[in-house]
């Protein structure tokens, strides 16, 4: 049994070698000749999986170690009776913490308290739901927009995108990319609703590049529209607009979900799915794979102020560390993917044990994802 895995899937060799021969390969471009004798293919979001890649190949199972799967032609796989699995929610925590890191940058630069702002979340699935929960735990006003969930009658108060555009100080997008149908999210932000968006708003996209019409956004910024913009995803990738890159406040190379924990969850989820497929069920405890972080414990005193929160968040991950490298090399062919391939280890807040002398501080930190204790 031969299993082909993306070389950027941590722990894939360690896990899949128990099942057969494992070969790690680049995801873009994927060496198509390797598929001639491959039984299972494990990819990440940079690999387009469709008839062009797999027609006539012996592959019987495709797994993507990512939450989204718009890079996979699932309808074609189903027609060919090729089993498929994704990793829903695997990097949700990482994306939430990316958004918080960016918000702490703006809060410091502009001198605002997050609790004085209204955050509009578009797409309230694994990422958006977790983001809303953490923001609310801190006392931040949140407006939610999720038409599919609203239509299902889910037990939440949902608002229209137009309401969020008008009322939210911060807009962050966590919707899947749908290019057709009732819940079309292609160019959800476009020229017409950029006109509606008041000046001074913060716009964050860490979902899919095409959710925002990048040409329309660039045009608005060139015309003097005053917006603070964070883009982790681009239209197109990897050949993003250098002009737009130079206009946005924070720019990163599609790495919002790239924590070690998030990647490891993706690997373990598709590993477990493949084990089920071949009739050898397994369960992997993430803690058995992850190393101890470089900074594992810190002590804090007093109440949880925004200043303290910002220090803790940026101790674990400061989004600006990923902005500068992209700006340096974005115009060089292949460098966007290299930044992703050789991405430095990044951990989640839960990897940091925070020892607090204030029980309320410990409780709040635990509520938003830190590993806090009161002593």
Swiss-Prot record:
Glycoprotein listed as a keyword: no
Binding site for substrate: 45, 66, 258
Cytoplasm listed as a keyword: yes
InterPro entries, alphabetized: D-isomer_2_OHA_DH_cat_dom (IPR006139), D-isomer_DH_CS (IPR029753), D-isomer_DH_CS1 (IPR029752), D-isomer_DH_NAD-bd (IPR006140), Erythronate-4-P_DHase (IPR020921), Erythronate-4-P_DHase_dimer (IPR024531), NAD(P)-bd_dom_sf (IPR036291), PdxB_dimer_sf (IPR038251)
UniProt GO cellular component terms: cytosol
Pfam families documented for this protein: 2-Hacid_dh, 2-Hacid_dh_C, DUF3410
SUPFAM superfamilies (UniProt xref): Formate/glycerate dehydrogenase catalytic domain-like, NAD(P)-binding Rossmann-fold domains
GO MF entry, a single one: NAD binding
Subcellular localization: Cytoplasm
Active site annotation, chain numbering: 208, 237, 254
Binding site for NAD(+): 146, 175, 206-208, 232, 257
Annotated GO biological process: 'de novo' pyridoxal 5'-phosphate biosynthetic process; pyridoxine biosynthetic process
Predominant place of localization: cytoplasm
Domain of life per record: Bacteria
Pathway(s) served: Cofactor biosynthesis; pyridoxine 5'-phosphate biosynthesis; pyridoxine 5'-phosphate from D-erythrose 4-phosphate: step 2/5
Family: Belongs to the D-isomer specific 2-hydroxyacid dehydrogenase family. PdxB subfamily.
Subunit relationships: Homodimer.
NCBIfam families: PRK00257.1
Function: Catalyzes the oxidation of erythronate-4-phosphate to 3-hydroxy-2-oxo-4-phosphonooxybutanoate.
Classification via HAMAP family: PdxB (MF_01825)
Name of the protein in question: Erythronate-4-phosphate dehydrogenase
Organism: Proteus mirabilis (strain HI4320)
